[in-house]
Regions:
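Terminal alpha-helical anchor/extension segments at protein ends
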Residues: 1-163
């Protein structure tokens, strides 16, 4: 897995932040896309139609001549699941603008698939953009917005208590 370092080029102004900043938290069930619009973050939830993992609970023998659970490690259902997952990752990748600073976050391997797909799309049109990848558990919307602000150098919002 290749990940951009935090010292790479970051947008300087609020206008750059508004045009280029996006954070994607993704797993097989959904993606949460956090994008700047002026002074606020716009949050979009994308649900997937990826079927759940079907895990065997014990040995299943289909053929007495084949040992330990059957001839193929992947069932037909698992292959279909991966096809659905690839379509979902493509749909999320196509929602991101080409000039945005991208932060991809997730707790499984789906965020790595999204990173690979974004890099593949970038190489097809001979461009490069900053893609920062991090493994993380599920976070609240506020935590995702704060992480995007931190990556873009905007810092947390400060409010005065009382007046």
């Amino acid at each position: 897995m290749t990940a951009a370092t935090e010292t790479e080029a970051r947008p300087d102004t609020t206008a750059d932040i508004a045009h280029r900043g996006v954070l994607v938290w993704i797993d097989a069930r959904e993606a949460v896309v956090v994008r700047w619009t002026g002074e606020e973050a716009a949050i979009e939830h994308l649900a997937s139609d990826v079927p759940a993992h079907a895990r065997a609970t014990r040995h299943v023998r289909y053929d007495p001549l084949t040992r330990h659970g059957g001839p193929d490690r992947q069932s037909a259902g698992e292959r279909r699941r991966i096809e659905h997952l690839d379509r979902f990752v493509d749909a999320v990748a196509n929602r991101l603008d080409r000039d945005e600073y991208v932060v991809v976050v997730g707790h499984g391997t789906v965020h790595e698939r999204l990173e690979a797909r974004l890099r593949e799309l970038d190489s097809q049109v001979r461009r490069s953009r900053t893609i920062n990848v991090r493994r993380a558990d599920r976070a609240t919307e506020r935590q995702l917005v704060a992480e995007l602000r931190e990556h873009l150098g905007a810092g947390p919002r400060r409010q005065r208590v009382g007046s």
